[in-house]
C-alpha cells in the first residue's frame, strides 16, 4: 500500500513539475500556482482533499521549486547539483548532474524500476479558450502505467498558452532535469516537447486499484523580482540522506 501511495505522490510531483519559466533578465522570476487534489480512498485508507500553493524561483543557472511547505527541489547548474529537501524530516538528498541512476539508486529502487513501465502520449487539439488573460490551446496527455501486473492509466487535460513570453528552451532545460529525477519518466521529456507554450490549467485523473484520483492545477501569477538571500541554498541543520524516488514524500 505504501508503494502505491508513493507512486501517486510521484505522479503528483510530475504534474506539479510543469511550472514553465519565462525569459531571463537581471531579476529572477517568481511563479505561483494553486493545486487542488480530491479526496480518495484506496484499500480502505482515505487521503483527504488537499489544497496547496506551489511556487518556483528561477535565475539564470538555478531554480527552486516548492511544493506546499513540505518539500523543495533546487537545481544548481553552476554546481552541477540537484537537491531534494524534506522540510518535515529536515533532510536532503544530493544528486550530481548529469544523473546516473546506476550510481545513485539503492537496490530496492532498481528492483521497483524493473517492475514498472510508463508510456506517455501527447496530442494537440484544435480547441481554444481564454483563461484569465491568456489565450490557450488544449492538449490531451494519456499515460499508460504498468506496475507489478497492474494497469494504472492517467489522463491530463492541459491548456497551454504562448502569450506569456516564455523561453521554451530554458523551460525544457529545467523541467527536463526535474522529470529525470524519476527514472520511470525518462521518455517524458521528448514527448512533452510537443507542447508549444505554458501550461495555464491542468486537469489530471488517475485510476488506481479501483479508485480514481483527480486534481486541478492552475497558474496564478508570474513576477519578475529579486530572489531573497538563500533561496537557492540548502537550509542549515538538515541531514543528508540517500535519494530514493519511490520514497519521496509530499
Question: Over which residues does each language-model region extend?
Answer:
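C-terminal segment of classical bacterial N-terminal signal peptides
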Residues: 15-24
